[in-house]
A protein has these predicted regions:
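Intrinsically disordered, low-complexity regulatory regions
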Residues: 1-106
């Protein structure tokens, strides 16, 4: 029996390390794509992201820059002994991975 993409990704996550982190980002992308596509069961690899990134590389650069600023802000907050109120470092790192992946897949 052939394993599904999600099952393969979950297996990679369970193994940990760098491949597990990338797989975790892809799983997050799959779940979020359900929210961004009106709950339709669309293959996340087939989603047209041009409306989200209308200015090509500039749009991707802006989003990656924004996420990097958030990451740096959260690190500073952590160094000051404070916790994030919402999405933390791991969530922001996963977003950065996915936005970089969107750029590479364009």
């Amino acid at each position: 029996m052939e394993a599904s993409t999600v099952e393969l990704l979950e297996e990679l996550v369970s193994r940990g390390g760098h491949p597990g982190a990338i797989a975790k980002a892809v799983l997050l992308c799959i779940k979020k794509s359900e929210d961004y596509n009106h709950g339709k069961n669309i293959n996340p690899h087939d989603v047209d992201r041009s409306e989200y990134f209308p200015f090509g590389a500039v749009s991707y650069a802006q989003m990656l820059h924004t996420k990097a600023l958030r990451f740096n802000s959260l690190v500073q907050k952590q160094m000051d002994g404070q916790e994030s109120n919402f999405e933390g470092l791991d969530d922001t790192a996963l977003d950065i991975i996915n936005y970089a992946g969107f750029y590479l897949a364009r």
